Amino acid sequence: MKSFVNYDQNSDFSIYNIPFGVAVFANEYIACCTRIGDMVIDLATLYDYGFFDDIEGLNENIFEAYTLNEFIELGKPVTKAVRLKIQELLAENSKLALDEKTIEECFFNIDQIRMMMPVHIPNYTDFYSSIEHATNVGKMFRDPANALLPNWKHLPVGYHGRASSIVVSGTDIIRPKGQTKPADLDSPIFGPSKQLDFELEM
């Protein structure tokens, strides 16, 4: 399948990968969006122009939301139908390909917009799903000879995660502050942490 939008064939955002997100456009206008190549597409305006009229169950103004939560709650049949419709619209010789006015109003270079958190995450649970990670943590906090808890292989071990730690890609990370005690001082001091660890969540 070819698109009328020119993009690098090595791009992560081809016509076969239609992601959903939320972006801040010009004049602080916020809408749900998708992307192909380096172009971000305003789905709310596409909806207003009737390009999704044949999709059943798609609520009016659904793409004007500040998160994708309501859209996701419509269920897989609806979100899949929208994704297939977007692929159809982005294809060569589609009705959108010939609509210069809509393209001008709905298509923006990635440098012209700012991405937001795509979903509201009120809470989440983190799991020890890697035996290497669980073993390393066990060595730090328990007997290194018995680092892995006996129940680890028999039930999922989870713990409460901090939703505030989930941020948009590219967000600056603020180094935490707390107490540290230099070896040459009698009392601890307050300041930025000396070391910072991080995890990649997938």
Give residue spans per PLM region.
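Active-site microenvironments in enzyme catalytic cores
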Residues: M1-E28, R35, I41-M202
